[in-house]
Amino acid sequence: MEYRFNTPLNGNIAMTYHYHEDAALRRDKSLYKFVWVQSGTLDIEVDHVVMHLEKDEIISLTPLHHVEVKRVEGEYLTFLFNSNFYCIYGHDKEVSCNGFLFHGSSHIMRLQLSAAQSEQLKSIIDIFAGEFGIKDNLQEEMLRIILKRFIITYTRIAREKLDVGQDKEKSFDIIRRYYAVSYTHL
């Protein structure tokens, strides 16, 4: 399964099970990424640190991360998009490109999904794949909405897994703002 959509303003979104084989996607340093192991295992190097991911583990990565797939034993999904497609300033700070999933921690957001959580995200992926078959002037906005739904659902799962309440929210917000300022001035 391979889906790509490009907007007239250089917005890009893609979903693939073959990221490691796609030189164009690997070369594109503007992409935010969700890497989700659907079966088997995946060894992926992020910023020169090898991570061993197993079934239903998911990570979120920014364009600043250097990513190299080392070993694939099974199937994994990579969901990618750039800031021209989604990251406009109007998005809520928690589900934006400067939000919780990408800049909410000093570590890479890595979660083990339960079967129910995996099904939640899979249903969104199925809707996304179905939308690629509909070629009309509403497709771009629908893909953006589906991406936002994926991000919101994943954010809720992460907040629950990490037990983020009001007391921890300030710490995450400070980290998020630090990354936003750093990214702006680099």
Label each region the model flagged:
Residues 184-185:
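Conserved small/polar residues in nucleotide/adenosyl-binding loops
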